[in-house]
Amino acid sequence: MGDIDYTASDDGRIAYVTLARPEYRNAQSRRLLEGLDVAFSTAADDHDVRVIVLQGEGDHFSSGHDLGTPAELDDRRDRPWPDGQLGEQRRSLELNVAATLRWRDIPKPTIAAVQGFCIYGGWIIASAMDLIVAADDARFLPAHFQYFSVPWDLGPRRTKELLWKAEFLDADELEAMGFVSQVVPRHELSSATTDLATQIARQDPFVASMIKRSVNEMQDQMGFRTSVTSAHSTYMQIQMAGKVVPKGQEGRIRRLPSVDRSLRD
């Protein structure tokens, strides 16, 4: 699975899916996202697995999208998408929307264990999980990204305010808003997440699956899926209006300007 590590608990009931690019703060390359898709499919198809835990190796859960590490640039050269806007839209839809919707709909409970930075793409994959356990050092940064779940995660008014202010949010703030399920000391993140997963794994797997399906379908009836896919079109318009990584500078690993502003503030 490349940049993904996959393990299971001794009894096989809990699958641990780990983002394994700590040297790049688990930036999400194409290969990492493809490996994540394989890992989630493996866990979903394993009848012994009852709960899936998503976690990040190292000090940070995920710094977001890979803007140009050597491995990502090599992959873009070796496996290019079609040129132009059509290729960019296809890449964005397949890697960040279609895949994330699949992960949201995995018919088993999923938990994200978040520490350190959870920026943009990090928020996307954490949001797709059913529950989030966050360390007290976790810092989250949402935006109008490809999989725009934020209004559903936080509510419309709070979303407008936070995206306009473009400030990092700590775990306690997001627990109060209902996005984070619980906040624990950093050194207890792994054990607390496993304890929660173990408790949920005691639930009848069919009942757990039906509970998740009912809640997700309720959101879909309210327009979640349509909202996410429609918002992606707006995202693409924003990207076409002004690219954040100009052509010819793809080899320079950099942060998005919006992330730099948030870090300064």
Regions found by a protein language model. Give the residues of each.
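Terminal peptide-recognition signature
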Residues: V17, R21, G35-L36, L54, ...
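A general structural signal for well-ordered alpha-helical segments in protein cores
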Residues: N96, Y147, P156-T159, A208-I211, ...
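C-terminal alpha-helix plus adjacent terminal tail
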Residues: M1-G12, F61, D170, S191, ...
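Crotonase-fold acyl-CoA enzyme core
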Residues: L101-P205
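Charged catalytic carboxylate motif
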Residues: R31-G35, L95, R102, A192, ...
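Glycine- (often His-adjacent) and acidic-residue-rich active-site loop
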Residues: Y24, G56-A98, C118, R252
